[in-house]
Amino acid sequence: MIIGGSASQDLAAHVAEELNDDLCYVETKKFPDGERYLRVDGEIDDEVTVIQSTGYPQDENLMELLFLISNLKDLGAKKVRVVVPYMGYARQEKRFHDGEAVSAKIVANLIQSAGADEFITFNIHEKCVLDFFDIPTTNISAMGAIAEYIDEKIDEKPLIVAPDKGAYPFAQEIAEILDCECTYLSKVRLGPDKVETRIVDVEGSSDETVNVDSVKGKKAFIIDDIIATGGTIVNAVKILKEYGAKSVDVCCVHPILVNGATMRIYAAGANSLISTNSLSADSSRVSLAKSIANVLRD
């Protein structure tokens, strides 16, 4: 049985369709004082999968998730698997300053305490967050789904570019699937007050060096896990355009996209902005339903 929270109802419906499983309806609403009402409509199976992202508004979506998990256990579910495509607070995985809350740890404890028996997510920003759980966890990569989308849209070998070294493993993963070249951008200090972002020379799969000259005339795809304000992406788009890329498309798993990020990315020269549906956005063109269904089948 699949149950979708209000943040992930469409995704839950597609997962249920992939698995040919029952989809249980959840009624949610707010009382006049702002408190949340939740009711599960239907008989509950022994094993239930809840799908609910906890992006903006994070606190509301998290509370709904906790209500769902606890309610399902009260209603007789023996096992509750929790799929959180995007986990809010996951970037607050450590104490940066004295007195700060380690919010990711608190959220993990809340999910477990509510009664979750298993936790599944996608491309969590800091993998150490999974260590906060004492229940089985799975961190699915969405790069296969993104690679499939890219492959269907173009008829030539693209160049996959990570906007920084941290995102390079994502670019490598997609490039391996598509059998194409990849590289990343890096900031090079030229003097006390001068920093320049450049393409990093890397050895390609054909033993040829991927460098600045490799960009000219290519369809470039920038790959990252999360785009929030988009500053790094805007910079990457501009650089690739300057280097002569035929087109620049931007892809990510989690489209947070705050402070006008989408508009600024397009203004920089991006051909398109593509993301998964871990969060609901205009860019959400890559479905995670098959990836979730494959894990649930195991």
From Swiss-Prot:
Active site: K187
A single Gene Ontology CC term: cytoplasm
Pathway: Metabolic intermediate biosynthesis; 5-phospho-alpha-D-ribose 1-diphosphate biosynthesis; 5-phospho-alpha-D-ribose 1-diphosphate from D-ribose 5-phosphate (route I): step 1/1
Enzyme Commission code: 2.7.6.1
GO MF term set: ATP binding; kinase activity; magnesium ion binding; ribose phosphate diphosphokinase activity
Record keyword Iron-sulfur present: no
Residues given in the record as Mg(2+) 1 binding sites: H125
Binding residue positions for Mg(2+) 2: D164
CDD domains: PRTases_typeI
GO process annotations (BP): 5-phosphoribose 1-diphosphate biosynthetic process; purine nucleotide biosynthetic process
Coiled coil: none
Cofactor binding comment, as recorded: Binds 2 Mg(2+) ions per subunit.
Enzyme class, spelled out: transferase
Major localization listed first in the record, in broad terms: cytoplasm
Location(s) in or outside the cell: Cytoplasm
UniProt keyword Metal-binding, yes or no: yes
Physiological role: Involved in the biosynthesis of the central metabolite phospho-alpha-D-ribosyl-1-pyrophosphate (PRPP) via the transfer of pyrophosphoryl group from ATP to 1-hydroxyl of ribose-5-phosphate (Rib-5-P).
Name of protein: Ribose-phosphate pyrophosphokinase
Species per Swiss-Prot/TrEMBL record: Methanobrevibacter smithii (strain ATCC 35061 / DSM 861 / OCM 144 / PS)
